[in-house]
Amino acid sequence: MKTNYEIRYAAHPEDARSYDTKRIRRDFLIEKVFSADEVNMVYSMYDRMVVGGAMPVKEVLKLEAIDPLKAPYFLTRREMGIFNVGGPGVVRAGDTIFQLDYKEALYLGAGDRDVTFESTDAAHPAKFYFNSLAAHRNYPDKKVTKADAVVAEMGTLEGSNHRNINKMLVNQVLPTCQLQMGMTELAPGSVWNTMPAHVHSRRMEAYFYFEVPEEHAVCHFMGEVDETRHVWMKGDQAVLSPEWSIHSAAATHNYTFIWGMGGENLDYGDQDFSLITDLK
């Protein structure tokens, strides 16, 4: 197995206004989340979130304590949320085994123990997408399915944004230190998410897009309300959203995305909305 990681530094919004396409993609887009028998991570300075993916095929993959953590185990001072977006797989956390099927999630609390990822069937490998944030205490590990989620049905087909927001790793479902994660599924014929757009200065966010057909793409919108930028993305890619940035998208096909947040509070509704007509 191989572990790959990079560090991404935070940007001031006034500086980000001057970024060209190449710089925007370099600083915010995470193009390669999954590689066969590798663990890929981006250590972001936005609330020190780690965004990553593990794709075990022929090997069992270990969650290694990368050097920036300066810790004996990855989860020594961290909590983690994991979603399986591939074939059936297994996550082992210490002596506990969790079977995760497609679109099932797992919360791992802080604590010294080994964590490994493996696939049940190498011909249909699991793909474990994860977000991790600093944690001040331990909360119990817990598997969460869509049946456990707080579900909000939003939007309309006429507005091209009919979607179900599955709030899965949130404080209404289980206790966490600062991590919140969920999965939004857009209905056929709907392509817009998070519109009207909002920001939340108390929390950063990361989006991971999947269920995007190969011949289609997602146009993710970011930036300040009056200085928006776009990032064209494919399926199985992620993007970082600073606390000062909107995070929205339209696509050429319906899709699903996983959102993950961390920062000052656990209030999902703490959002500062902008009018659609104010976007520039």
Swiss-Prot record:
Annotated positions binding Zn(2+): 198, 200, 205, 247
Superkingdom of the source species: Bacteria
A GO term, aspect molecular function: 4-deoxy-L-threo-5-hexosulose-uronate ketol-isomerase activity
Cofactor annotation remark: Binds 1 zinc ion per subunit.
Keywords on record: Isomerase, Metal-binding, Zinc
Alphabetical list of SUPFAM superfamilies matching this protein: RmlC-like cupins
Cofactor(s) needed for function: Zn(2+)
Catalytic activity from the UniProt record: 5-dehydro-4-deoxy-D-glucuronate = 3-deoxy-D-glycero-2,5-hexodiulosonate
Pfam families: KduI
GO term, biological process aspect, one: D-glucuronate catabolic process
Listed pathway(s): Glycan metabolism; pectin degradation; 2-dehydro-3-deoxy-D-gluconate from pectin: step 4/5
EC number annotated for this UniProt entry: 5.3.1.17
Family recorded in the similarity comment: Belongs to the KduI family.
Record function comment: Catalyzes the isomerization of 5-dehydro-4-deoxy-D-glucuronate to 3-deoxy-D-glycero-2,5-hexodiulosonate.
PANTHER family xrefs: 4-DEOXY-L-THREO-5-HEXOSULOSE-URONATE KETOL-ISOMERASE (PTHR38461:SF1)
Record-given protein name: 4-deoxy-L-threo-5-hexosulose-uronate ketol-isomerase
